[in-house]
């Protein structure tokens, strides 16, 4: 599943080509993905793209006629093409945003769990207003994390993956961050110390920043808009490495289902207090 670094990578890849352009048309081949594609998108011809941004895992295309919200879902990807070199759409190519300059932003999604939505203002859209702070923002502090964790009996891995607490810390990066902080994924969030919250906040930011620099993580479906894979998978410490030796201590990496998601950890580097 594309997570925050992958969406940020998409944003940085397509923004130089789309910002300031005028939409010629939006071709919708599949009327329903996770939700029905907003009918307003069919009336975007002639709208100027003012800017692009990201909120959590939503890519937002700001136009003079409202905002287009794109979510990649489980298997979605965006590719930049040029109409001067037409490429036939595959059965999984559901949406094309075409500019008057001939640039095509093509959305591919084999599992159709993504979304193309419209809002007058993205920041007021219900799916956006309930989100927690961005993990790379100044509002995501260790003090905030510590206060939010009080009286939370849920496992810390589920806690940091909760978008009401902080957005964008998906399964891969939660496992990696907890390893870097030396925190067992099953530790109850309320048992986090202030020192651990400082460490956890710092490593979440470090892990996500590094993943963005590496272009995200390619495990199966994700590719960058230019077709290249993300390279963060090459430096994963624990995720997907069950039975392999920990790069720090040599202990075998373990895996356990926590909150219906596979979680990876080193039992020695991340001991669970008794």
Swiss-Prot record:
Alphabetical GO biological process terms: base-excision repair
Catalytic residues, chain numbering: 2-3, 57, 261
Native organism: Haemophilus ducreyi (strain 35000HP / ATCC 700724)
Subunit structure as annotated in this protein's UniProt entry: Monomer.
Cross-referenced InterPro entries: DNA_glyclase/AP_lyase_DNA-bd (IPR015886), DNA_glyclase_Znf_dom_DNA_BS (IPR015887), Formamido-pyr_DNA_Glyclase (IPR020629), FPG_cat (IPR012319), MutM-like_N-ter (IPR035937), Ribosomal_uS13-like_H2TH (IPR010979), Znf_DNA_glyclase/AP_lyase (IPR000214), Znf_FPG/IleRS (IPR010663)
Name of encoding gene: mutM
Tagged with keyword Ion transport: no
Protein known as: Formamidopyrimidine-DNA glycosylase
Catalytic activity: Hydrolysis of DNA containing ring-opened 7-methylguanine residues, releasing 2,6-diamino-4-hydroxy-5-(N-methyl)formamidopyrimidine; 2'-deoxyribonucleotide-(2'-deoxyribose 5'-phosphate)-2'-deoxyribonucleotide-DNA = a 3'-end 2'-deoxyribonucleotide-(2,3-dehydro-2,3-deoxyribose 5'-phosphate)-DNA + a 5'-end 5'-phospho-2'-deoxyribonucleoside-DNA + H(+)
Keyword Manganese attributed: no
Residue intervals passing through the bilayer: none
Family: Belongs to the FPG family.
CC cofactor: Zn(2+)
Molecular function in Gene Ontology: 8-oxo-7,8-dihydroguanine DNA N-glycosylase activity; class I DNA-(apurinic or apyrimidinic site) endonuclease activity; damaged DNA binding; zinc ion binding
Zinc finger FPG-type: from-to: 237-271
Cofactor binding annotation: Binds 1 zinc ion per subunit.
Keyword terms, alphabetized: DNA damage, DNA repair, DNA-binding, Glycosidase, Hydrolase, Lyase, Metal-binding, Multifunctional enzyme, Zinc, Zinc-finger
Residues where DNA binds: 92, 111, 152
The protein's Enzyme Commission number: 3.2.2.23, 4.2.99.18
UniProt xrefs under HAMAP family: Fapy_DNA_glycosyl (MF_00103)
Reported function: Involved in base excision repair of DNA damaged by oxidation or by mutagenic agents. Acts as a DNA glycosylase that recognizes and removes damaged bases. Has a preference for oxidized purines, such as 7,8-dihydro-8-oxoguanine (8-oxoG). Has AP (apurinic/apyrimidinic) lyase activity and introduces nicks in the DNA strand. Cleaves the DNA backbone by beta-delta elimination to generate a single-strand break at the site of the removed base with both 3'- and 5'-phosphates.
């Amino acid at each position: 599943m594309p997570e925050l670094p992958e969406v940020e990578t998409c944003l940085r890849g397509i923004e130089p080509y789309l910002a300031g352009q005028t939409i010629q048309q939006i071709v919708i081949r599949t009327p329903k993905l996770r939700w029905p594609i907003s009918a307003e998108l069919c009336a975007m011809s002639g709208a100027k793209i003012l800017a692009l941004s990201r909120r959590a895992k939503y890519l937002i295309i700001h136009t003079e006629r409202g905002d287009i919200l794109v979510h990649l879902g489980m298997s979605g990807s965006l590719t930049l093409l040029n109409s001067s070199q037409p490429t036939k759409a595959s059965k999984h190519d559901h949406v094309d945003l075409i500019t008057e300059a001939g640039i095509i932003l093509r959305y591919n999604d084999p599992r159709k769990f993504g979304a193309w939505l419209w809002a007058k203002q993205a920041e007021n859209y219900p799916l956006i207003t309930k989100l927690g702070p961005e993990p790379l923002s100044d509002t995501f502090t260790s003090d905030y994390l510590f206060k939010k964790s009080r009286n939370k009996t849920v496992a810390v891995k589920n806690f940091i993956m909760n978008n009401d607490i902080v957005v964008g810390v998906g399964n891969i990066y939660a496992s990696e961050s907890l390893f870097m902080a030396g925190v067992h994924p099953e530790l109850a969030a309320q048992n986090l110390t202030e020192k651990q919250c400082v460490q956890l906040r710092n490593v979440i930011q470090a892990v996500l920043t590094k993943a963005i620099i590496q272009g995200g993580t390619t495990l199966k479906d994700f590719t960058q808009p230019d077709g290249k894979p993300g390279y963060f998978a090459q430096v994963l410490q624990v995720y997907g490495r069950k039975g392999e030796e920990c790069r720090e201590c040599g202990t075998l990496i373990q895996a356990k289902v926590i909150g219906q998601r596979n979680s990876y950890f080193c039992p020695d580097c991340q001991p669970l207090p008794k």
